[in-house]
Amino acid sequence: MKKNYIFYTLFFLFSFSINSQVVLGDGDILNSNVPIEAYYGYSYSQTIYKSSQINASGSITGVSYTATPSTTLTTSGQWVVYVGLTEKETFESTSDWIPISELSQVYAATAEAPTTISEEGVVTITFDAPFEYDGSSNLVIAVEENQDGYDSSSDDFYSTEADQIASIYYYSD
């Protein structure tokens, strides 16, 4: 039986009168294929975060994902990140995509400035422009990785198991 995973080992960087972070999940599962699948040449994922899990409103200025310390992004560094608001709480199926036209591109890496990972295995994405989150809608974050090449099959990110489909993904060579 296919397990459903939500990619919760993620920090939302909110801007209020003081800076704050929202941490979701405990990150106890590896290889859920989100936010990217580094072992393939192309990957795309979408994850829904419920407003009750975020419990804040304001400007989102970035996200962070936690990977295994040995993970590299040598040939998986050209990430494009999209964010949007949705009334959906879960995906109905693994093909129930939220149209990209309903999302805003907030980050795009290039060959000259690829997405990088720290020695501790943290990928921090600082958005090109803040995304205004209303605090009442659910949030969807989509991550596309389209750099030619393949990293190791052991390059994995942490996630948390969920009862319903909160993340969907696609990958190919």
Question: Language-model segments: what does each one mean?
Answer:
Residues 14-43:
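Boundary/junction segments of secreted and surface-exposed precursor proteins
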Residues 55, 77, 82-163:
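Aromatic- and Gly/Pro-enriched, solvent-exposed loop/edge beta-strand patches characteristic
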Residues 22-30, 54-57, 75-80:
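N-terminal/edge-of-domain interface segments
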Residues 30-39, 72, 100-110:
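Surface-exposed, low-complexity/disordered Ser/Thr/Gly/Pro/Asn-rich loops and linkers
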Residues 40-54, 122-126:
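Short beta-strands within extracellular/lumenal beta-sheet-rich domains
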Residues 58-70, 141:
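A short beta-strand element within beta-rich, extracytoplasmic domains
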Residues 165-173:
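PGST-rich, cysteine-poor low-complexity/disordered linker and tail segments that act as flexible spacers
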Residues 4-16:
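Sec-dependent N-terminal signal peptides
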